[in-house]
């Protein structure tokens, strides 16, 4: 009953609403919590534990079946929501990790909660709420909710409406916002791709994050685990996709938990999406992703093979 009341209380206002009174105790938030920051000294056991727990941060099993079965409202709604989140990330110069978190929240929510059909404003409100939550987790500076809503949307929502939707999302996700995404693993896998287990360069990490954000919007990637996607991206970007050798003694025991053919399939899907992924990535992603973390750079002596 409480959940029904919460849903019924969601309000929507047209885009010409008066700003007066819309913001309730809302000021820009500054948070510094890196979502992907594994140091070289962190143990294999921690990463392997993440692999074991990553399923807790995925959409329900029947979600991709519903998307593939031709559920038009769900497909179109998801696409429009992700397109808006992408544009908002571009405008606010949020990094690809923020986009991936927002997408994760959106998919997990839609997989367990049916929204009423024919009410596009609810999906728009959901998109705003998911991006707001992701930004609070990942970004160091978060705009006020009214300022977050960019791109000339059909609807602009009061802060209290977004906050109510945020609460509904939090309840449905069981408050698990520190989601494990492909971004969570990418630095680790890139390091394992190097010849000397060296720290990857900012450039290589940025490029990998671009590929993750650019490609995983497609529904076909939902059938794969975040660790599998991260491994495939690391292999692809480092030029090792065609030489997948998980049994190599220099590789981590973690690779024994991955299915070689599934990882290779993801890599082929990524490469088939085209070579202009970076040009499709939101403006500012390179700058934001490079400065979000304190990486050691080894550009001058990198032993990685960069794709041209």
From Swiss-Prot:
Q: Which GO terms describe its biological process?
A: cell division
Q: Which InterPro entries match?
A: Cyclin (IPR039361), Cyclin-like_dom (IPR013763), Cyclin-like_sf (IPR036915), Cyclin_C-dom (IPR004367), Cyclin_N (IPR006671), Cyclins_cyclin-box (IPR048258)
The tissues where this chain's protein is expressed are given as: Expressed in shoot apical meristem, leaf primordia vascular tissues and tapetum of anthers.
Q: Quick check: keyword GTP-binding in the entry?
A: no
* Keywords associated with the record: Cell cycle, Cell division, Cyclin
- PROSITE patterns under this entry? CYCLINS (PS00292)
Q: What induces it?
A: By sucrose.
- What is an example of a Pfam family matching this protein? Cyclin_N
Q: Which family does it belong to?
A: Belongs to the cyclin family. Cyclin D subfamily.
Quaternary organization:
Interacts with CDKA-1, CDKB2-1, KRP4/ICK7, KRP5/ICK3, KRP6/ICK4 and KRP7/ICK5.
Chain's role? May activate cell cycle in the root apical meristem (RAM) and promote embryonic root (radicle) protrusion.
Name the record gives this protein: Cyclin-D4-1
Which species? Arabidopsis thaliana (Mouse-ear cress)
Gene of this entry: CYCD4-1
